[in-house]
Design a protein with these regions (language model features):
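Active-site-proximal flexible loops/turns
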Residues: 9, 46-48, 88-89, 137-138, ...
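Hydrophobic h-region of N-terminal signal peptides that target proteins for export
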Residues: 9-17
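Active-site acidic carboxylates
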Residues: 19-123
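Internal catalytic-core helix/loop-beta-alpha segment
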Residues: 110-159
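Short glycine/serine/threonine-rich phosphate/pyrophosphate-binding segments
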Residues: 161-168
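Short conserved active-site loop signatures built around small residues
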Residues: 172
Length: 172
């Protein structure tokens, strides 16, 4: 299957506008497109988060603009979240210390840190797809879901660019 990956560093690059339009100048306007919103959870985005990425909170308006544009073109929206068990048994070795000695860890489903940051809200037709490693494709059913939806192009937006956005782009 042909896949084209448009990487959006911190969701900003695709939102370049021209004088005639408030919308992105991208030529991608087909209906076989999905936006993958990656790791926009409190622990990564909110300044009080355990692994906050500097500047990530400022990308929320740009991501919302990208999503609105995509929805106007009937693009799919897939929310990729990093999910870990409270025990930390499923985390990468360098992050195990965040789960020991009574610590609650990060990106645990059902916790504040694991929730999407304020300002981003999935709609009922959106897909929620948890991941357990950097890439949204590694050991998940994301590829199967995208194929079944007829998606041939993915637009990546989110945080943790050196790890999760890039890992997802590499595996796409």
């Amino acid at each position: 299957m042909k896949k084209i990956v448009l990487m959006v560093m911190m969701a900003m690059a695709v939102l370049t506008t021209n004088a005639q339009s408030e919308y992105p100048t991208s030529k991608v306007e087909k209906h076989d497109v999905a936006i993958l919103v990656i790791d926009m959870q409190n622990d990564f985005v909110d300044p009080k988060g355990k692994l906050c990425v500097a500047g990530a909170k400022a990308t929320v308006p740009a991501i919302n603009k990208l999503i609105a544009y995509g929805r106007s073109k009937n693009w799919k929206v897939v929310w990729i979240t990093r999910d870990h068990r409270t025990s930390g048994v499923d985390v990468d070795a360098p992050r195990i210390p965040l789960f020991v000695d009574g610590k609650t860890g990060y990106c645990v489903p059902g916790t504040w840190g694991g929730a999407l940051v304020d300002g981003l809200k999935p709609e009922k037709e959106d897909i929620m797809s948890p991941k357990y490693r950097n890439s949204a494709f590694f050991n998940t059913n994301l590829d199967l879901m995208l194929r079944r939806m007829g998606v041939k192009t993915v637009v990546l937006a989110g945080t943790q660019y050196p790890n999760c956005v890039r890992g997802t782009a590499n595996d796409a």
